[in-house]
Amino acid sequence: NYGAGGNGGGGGQGGTGGRGCSQCGSGNGGNGGAGGSGGTGGYGGGSVFFISPQINLGANSVISCNGSNGASGIAGTVGGNGQGAGGNGGTGGDGGNGAGGNGGFILLAYTNKTFTSGYSITVAGGAAGTLSGAGGNAGKTGVIKELSI
């Protein structure tokens, strides 16, 4: 549940080059553009265990097992120009966004605790990559577990 986010999907195939105009000779259509590469997924937040008879968290204490953000997919390239009367090649599909890493797991096991207001415990999921329209999911929120021992 807390591993790295998956890689973004591969870019779509470039569009077919346009046909040459029959009245103007048989110019070749341009090549389709290359598909963009998928973004790398974010890393999971990992795990932290605090097991002690007494746990103290001060006002500036920070415990963080957040997932990292996924990388953005790379946009597809534009196809080449046609030769002669040929049309231009289509633009390649965009690569998928990398998924955000899932938040991790934090365990606080104690007999007594002293938590001062202002501390921070977070297990947020990472954001997906931000290439427009290229999919990718945000990471899931992790788990914070308190246990009396």
Report residues per predicted region.
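Alpha-helical support elements that line or immediately flank enzyme active sites
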Residues: 53-55, 113
